[in-house]
Amino acid sequence: MTIGSVTVVEADLGVLTSLSPVGDGKDFAAALKAAHGLGAPKPGRATGRDGQRCLWFARSEVLLAGPVPDKTLEAHAAVVDQSDGWACVTLSGAGAVDVLARLVPVDFRESIFKRGHTARTLVQHMSASITRTGADTFLILVFRSMAGTLVHELKVAMEAVASRG
């Protein structure tokens, strides 16, 4: 759906896997790098790119998006398939930050929230994960049961931003 200069589309991220490292996480980080070529993200950050991404998701939890997790990770982390639990969209366009400003209590200006930054936050009343993947592009994940509500809230905000001209 495109309204004004902003587009929202469903994002197929492939397999979504919650990884909760055991211990200090160093062995997990090495295993993740060896298995998938991805660094373990620091809090508030994401690593990788489309097709293979790792998002900080919470304290001692990351979300591997894309590949099926390598079996070697099971020795270093709790590995849980979350693929059917999340709805994922990409919000993009020159007014994307303005749309998010109407819905999310996070400063998404590019000087503050740079490419590769990620936040667990709220979109209105919905728990969400938002990651900046490009200059004007954001990956948004909400619980699957909230997919319709997310699209509705984004549409209302997109219409409001577009009406400003």
What spans do the regions from the language model cover?
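Basic, glycine/lysine-rich polyanion-binding surfaces/domains
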Residues: 1-165
